[in-house]
């Protein structure tokens, strides 16, 4: 096969051939379907979670800053597995907002552009997170745990100020309901947290 039929538009980061009507661009500014959009978001999410930078960020939170106990049970990493949970926004929501912003402004992007910007938000502390016991983290994602907003670390307000306009109504409702949860109206207390409640 001849390689000289493959050409490149270096400025646009695009491959093409005079022999074929189709070209291939590194960056996109549209999706052909909702499933393609969600697949792209999930790919970004997986790439971020697998990255060295994400692991360094997580380890810095837990090992260096010593934020290494469950905010609910106060059990520490010496006793149990502790997760860092993105809370306002979720990682999926954060990625969606960045993609939606780019789509709305007709800015071309690729997976790596989105992942880099998300990691920059992590390193600027411009997102919310809490440390949770692994089983509490599962409980939250199963809809069985409320997290009071005063437990959240990081500048989650930055996200709301700068990216909420790029979210759909369902995402906004979810975030608003989470923002409204405090210690006086959540479904548990320190002496009666969900792990001890019969379900």
Identify the meaning behind each predicted range.
Residues 1-69, 74-78, 167-199:
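A boundary/linker detector
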Residues 69, 83, 132:
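The −1 position to Zn-ligating cysteines in a subset of zinc-ribbon hairpins
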Residues 122-128, 132-199:
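A detector for short metal-coordination/catalytic motifs
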Residues 32, 60, 74, 85-87, ...:
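Histidine (H) residue identity feature
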């Amino acid at each position: 096969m001849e390689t000289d039929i493959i050409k490149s538009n270096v400025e646009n980061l695009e491959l093409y051939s005079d022999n074929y009507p189709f070209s291939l661009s590194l960056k996109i500014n549209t999706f052909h379907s909702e499933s393609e959009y969600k697949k792209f978001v999930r790919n970004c999410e997986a790439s971020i979670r697998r990255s060295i930078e994400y692991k360094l960020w997580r380890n810095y939170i837990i090992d260096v800053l010593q934020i290494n106990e469950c905010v609910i049970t106060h059990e520490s990493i010496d006793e149990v597995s502790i997760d860092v949970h993105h809370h306002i926004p979720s990682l999926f929501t954060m990625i969606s907002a960045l993609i939606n912003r780019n789509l709305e402004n007709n800015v071309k992007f690729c997976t790596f552009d989105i992942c880099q910007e998300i990691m920059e938000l992590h390193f600027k502390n411009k997102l919310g997170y809490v440390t949770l016991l692994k089983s509490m983290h599962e409980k939250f994602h199963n809809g069985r745990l409320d997290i009071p907003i005063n437990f959240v670390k990081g500048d989650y307000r930055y996200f709301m100020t700068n990216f909420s306009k790029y979210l759909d109504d369902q995402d906004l409702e979810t975030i608003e309901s989470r923002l409204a949860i405090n210690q006086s109206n959540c479904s548990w207390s320190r002496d009666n947290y969900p792990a001890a409640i019969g379900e």
